Curated annotation (Swiss-Prot):
Keyword tags: Acyltransferase, Cell shape, Cell wall biogenesis/degradation, Cytoplasm, Magnesium, Metal-binding, Multifunctional enzyme, Nucleotidyltransferase, Peptidoglycan synthesis, Repeat, Transferase
Protein name: Bifunctional protein GlmU
NCBIfam families: glmU, PRK09451.1
Keyword Cytoplasm attributed: yes
Positions with a binding annotation for Mg(2+): 105, 227
Length: 456
């Protein structure tokens, strides 16, 4: 039976000794963001009125990393078990709300599973998430009588008979705030570990005649925890496989789903094709018929219809209109903007630069702090010299300009419409419309020149 209000407690106090890291375990990343952030996001989507985060090791780093989230920070100075952690948060529980208990190192838990758990919670009872494992070694076993859940026995405290039980506790549960506070106050640490187990509340609830409803997740991997980097890497692959499956079923062509990483949010149009070893980070939008070549990295960018990004290009915080072509081996840095039909070729770098409609920068070029008009040709080896060691300056190039190879444009400088800049020119002054600009060192010819030779 569903109460109108619900808050969430996320346990995140563990150090994560087996990670062999100075970083708190829950801050290690999965799919580009901290594990605990996945759990916070799930709690938020579920509509939690408040999220209590129980922390201990690395508290300052946790607070700094999660500063944008609305959290109630609860200190667990000593790690004396899950029950002890919940006792620290208990003073913040309202009597008339449900409390959902989650873990910062169980990052794949889904909103759908949590909603089913919330819906299944009996009035005055407990909703408990359990799974059945072929090898339940090390996990707390679910004990039942006549099919009803009666308690949870930790592996270290279980009898040989109880250790044969395959149904195990995931640690995720939901109960009423008033009931939970009462049960937490009755817990003891009379067990092999000398800790306060949250699992003891199951037996306490059963003794009061309360119903415990067990719910299974859609996928066992939803409840997998992380204690070491091997487990984290396995969950990463599970997560990525799930994301790839969703994209394929929605019409996106992933040439090799096992070699695709989504570390953010991807929105795709129709007939999008993505080759192997592509990484998507942040918020990315791909229009209709976009093609992404092998080995590309796309981050926080919008790619318009019919664009093609050739292999091993990096696109970050950029905006491409329709029918642009990029790469191979191109780099678009933050602030790069390409208008319709523009082309950026191999070993071209753009930053805070706008390339107009139909304009081309085909090879070996740096365009920084630049505004480039339509139908402009940027020759190979062109550089906008935008930095004097202290300040950045802008280069403006008008429509229909032809820039020859090996040109340096020393900003601030403006090149007028229709101008032609000869190869090898260093432009230091503004150029008027339709002018030809060239700078040359006199070419010297020496007949009969004897090339120096090495002495033996």
């Amino acid at each position: 039976m569903l109460n109108s209000a619900m808050s969430v407690v996320i346990l995140a106090a563990g150090k994560g000794t087996r990670m062999y890291s100075d970083i708190p375990k829950v801050l290690h990343t999965l799919a580009g963001k901290p594990m605990v952030q996945h759990v916070i996001d799930a709690a938020t989507k579920l509509g939690a009125a408040q999220v209590h985060l129980v922390y201990g090791h690395g508290g300052e780093l946790l607070k700094q990393t999660l500063k944008d989230d609305k959290l109630n920070w609860v200190l667990q100075a000593e790690q004396l078990g899950t029950g002890h952690a919940m006792q620290q948060a208990a003073p913040f529980f309202s009597d008339d709300e449900d409390i959902l208990m989650l873990y910062g190192d169980v990052p794949l838990i889904s909103v759908e599973t949590l909603q089913r758990l919330r819906d299944a919670k009996p009035q005055g009872g407990i909703g408990l998430l359990t799974v059945k494992l072929d090898d339940p070694s090390g996990y707390g076993r679910i004990t039942r009588e006549n099919g009803k859940v009666t308690g949870i026995v930790e592996h270290k405290d279980a009898t040989d008979e109880q250790r044969q039980i395959q149904e195990i506790n995931t640690g995720i549960l939901i109960a009423n705030g008033a009931d939970l506070k009462r049960w937490l106050s009755k817990m003891t640490n009379n067990n092999a570990q000398g800790e306060y187990y949250i699992t003891d509340i199951i037996a306490l609830a059963y003794q009061e005649g309360r119903e415990i409803a067990a719910v299974h997740p859609a996928r066992i991997s939803e409840t997998d925890g992380v204690n070491n980097r091997l487990q984290l890497s396995r969950l990463e692959r599970i997560y990525q496989a799930e994301q790839a499956e969703k994209l394929l079923l929605s019409g996106v062509m992933l040439r090799d789903p096992a070699r695709f990483d989504l570390r953010g949010t991807l929105h795709c149009g129709m007939d999008v094709e993505i080759d192997a070893n592509v990484i998507i980070e942040g918020y990315v939008t791909l229009g209709h018929r976009v093609k992404i070549g092998a080995g590309c990295i796309i981050k926080n960018s919008v790619i318009g219809d019919d664009c093609e990004i050739s292999p091993y290009s990096v696109v970050e915080d950029a905006h491409l209109e329709a029918a642009c072509t990029i790469g191979p081996f191109a780099r678009l840095r933050p602030g790069a903007e390409l208008l319709a039909g523009a082309h950026v070729g191999n070993f071209v770098e753009m930053k805070k630069a706008r390339l107009g409609k139909g304009s081309k920068a085909g090879h070996l070029t740096y365009l920084g702090d630049a505004e480039i008009g339509d139908n402009v040709n940027i020759g190979a080896g062109t550089i906008t010299c935008n930095y004097d060691g202290a300040n950045k300056f802008k280069t403006v190039i008008g429509d229909d300009v032809f820039v020859g190879s090996d040109t340096q444009l020393v900003a601030p400088v403006t090149v007028g419409k229709g101008a032609t800049i000869a190869a090898g020119t260093t432009v230091t002054r503004n150029v008027a419309d339709n002018e030809l600009v060239l700078s040359r060192v006199p070419q010297v010819h020496k007949q009969g020149w004897q090339r120096p030779v090495k002495k033996k």
